[in-house]
Amino acid sequence: MRVRSKGQYRLFFNDGTGVYATFSGNKIAGYIRVDLGKVVYAVCSSEDSSGDEILFFGSDDGYVYQMDKGTSFDGSAVEAMLRFSYYHYDSPTRNKRFRKIQFEMSGDSTISLQFQPDYSFSDPDVPAGRTRNLNIEGSGGYWNIDNWDTFNWSGQIVSTAEENLDGVGTNMGMLILSEATYEQPHILQGVTVHYSPRRIRR
């Protein structure tokens, strides 16, 4: 299935899973695996009366579902997971004390996430990071530009939240989890990590 508005090509498999390939121009920007929880038998991409792209799929239960619409999977929570690759912050053999992390996100509603940092490629000799909960207020908007009731008054355009870290390692990766039924979609704009360099690992 081709999704013109997002520059995506979507492939679906007979177990309800799929792969979305996103393009930037003629180049692949990335892939993401999805699990719709329903077997996709037929797909349709069309336009509504406003000219906006709408997507549908038919499943083995006889129902037709609209994709990329609403906040749930037919009333069930949407689960999302993002794993960052390990990054050494430009010094792969130097230990670092990771002190704080700041998330930058945009979304129309409050965002509840869990995240777990992971140090030194999950080395069993390095203490594991603990799982933390994070609540981020929905983003603000611009008067006379954004749609009414889709932004928070007096809110930041990009919402931020920070949390202290207490890990030591040569690098850090991270797992971010989201599971919600009523949250609007959100976008992770950036992550800033504060750390102090330590000795070179020998």
Locations of regions flagged by a protein language model:
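Beta-sheet repeat architectures centered on beta-propellers
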Residues: 1-202
